[in-house]
Structures are given as C-alpha cells and as structure tokens.
Curated annotation (Swiss-Prot):
InterPro entries: MecA_C_sf, Neg-reg_MecA. Enables the recognition and targeting of unfolded and aggregated proteins to the ClpC protease or to other proteins involved in proteolysis. Acts negatively in the development of competence by binding ComK and recruiting it to the ClpCP protease. When overexpressed, inhibits sporulation. Also involved in Spx degradation by ClpC. GO terms for molecular function: protein-macromolecule adaptor activity. HAMAP family: MecA (MF_01124). This is Adapter protein MecA.
Length: 217
C-alpha cells in the first residue's frame, strides 16, 4: 500500500486489490459488509499514523476512486474551531468525477450503488448447508409471489429473497423470514457478489420451481 502525505490535514492511499486480499479481505465485501469495510479503513489509517503520524481524530472527509487495479482513497481531517468544522480539501482536476465519488467509507457502499435501489425494501441472501434443505423449504413455504432466486457459490447454495413492501407489511415479512431461516441461515453476502462470482441456478421464483421439479423425501 502506498501512502502519500498531501498536506497537514490530507493523506492519500493507493491499495491494490491484491494487497486487499493479502490482508484477508475480499474486494467486494469491503463495499457491502460495513464491519469489514470499517476494519480495512481503520487498518489503513493506523498504518498512516505509524508512518506519517496522521492521527485519526475529528470529522473526516473521505473520497474514494475505484480504479482498475485498486482503490485510491483521499482522507481529509477537519479542523474544529469554536464549534465549526473547517475542511481544506484538495481540488481534483476532474471536479465532476470527484463529486460523484465522495462516499462515506463507513457505510460499506458507494453512492452509485444507491441509484435505483429502494432502501425500504428488505432483501437477504440465505445460505443452506445441503441442497435437501432448500427442497424441504420449497415444500413447506407456499408464498409463490415472493421474489427469490437460487445461486451456487463456492460449493454452497444460496437463495436471494426480495420482499415487496407494497405486498407485505413488516410483521408479515418477519414471519416469512423466520420460516425460511428454519431451513437455512442468514448471510452477509450481497446479491452483487452472487451475480458476479456465483452461478445462477434458477432466475426467478426458485422455490416454486424447486417444488415442482423435486419431490420431498
């Protein structure tokens, strides 16, 4: 990882995806798993403090650029005076692109990921220890208009489920989720990771199709 001290309040990192993986992180989970994203960020900031005595205190302005070979991250520390925060932010030559890439790394995703996503909708990826567990679920869960897709990833099966708030209230969603988790387990995997690295087995209404093709033992 390269660390460049821009000025007294700003520091720039460049970390390759290989370096991220060598540190024990997955290049996708840092965006979609808040806890892991925070862990990587604080690890980088601790290294910056050790090398350049850049202390992590006060409000931070974080700018992230996802490049072909890694991430470029610019961190500017705000100066608090009389209750007011002053930020001396370096001006990028590509102002428009910079504005679009201003993200809060702690949220675990970029601002671009929010476009077109209804944040009120509950979605989850459920993992299964055995394929038979999914078959059993399909024969005991009969809400066929619930959006769900089946994926295979790293030797296991996963069901992505999307709840429509227009169809089901919060209590109904919780009840359905509880039923499904009797046969599987909740994961922190994202649908984006499933789509990119996994294999789609059934693209829509997976449980309904499984029930029709596989008899229950």
């Amino acid at each position: 990882m390269d660390i460049e001290r821009v000025n007294d309040t700003t520091i720039k990192f460049f970390i390759t995806y290989k370096d991220i993986e060598d540190r024990g992180f997955d290049r996708d989970e840092i965006w979609y798993n808040r806890e892991r994203g925070e862990e990587l960020f604080f690890e980088m900031m601790n290294e910056a403090n050790d090398r350049d005595e850049f202390e992590l205190d006060g409000p931070l302005w974080i700018q992230v650029h996802a490049l072909d070979k890694g991430l470029e991250i610019v961190v500017t520390r705000g100066q608090v005076s009389d209750g007011n925060v002053k930020l001396e932010i370096p001006v990028s030559q590509d102002k428009e692109n910079t504005d679009e890439n201003i993200v809060d790394l702690m949220t675990g995703h970029s601002s671009e990921d929010d476009e077109g996503i209804d944040t009120d909708q509950l979605e989850i990826v459920i993992g299964f220890n055995d394929f038979e567990d999914i078959i059993s679920l399909s024969h005991n869960f009969f809400i066929d208009d619930l959006e769900n897709e089946l994926y295979h990833f790293e030797g296991r099966y996963y069901l992505h489920v999307l709840f429509n708030d227009d169809q089901y209230n919060e209590d109904e969603q919780d009840d359905m989720l509880s039923q499904m988790l009797e046969y599987g387990y909740e994961t922190d995997l994202s649908i984006h990771r499933m789509q990119e690295y996994g294999k789609e087995i059934i693209g829509e209404y997976a449980l309904k199709h499984l029930r029709g093709h596989f008899p229950q033992n």
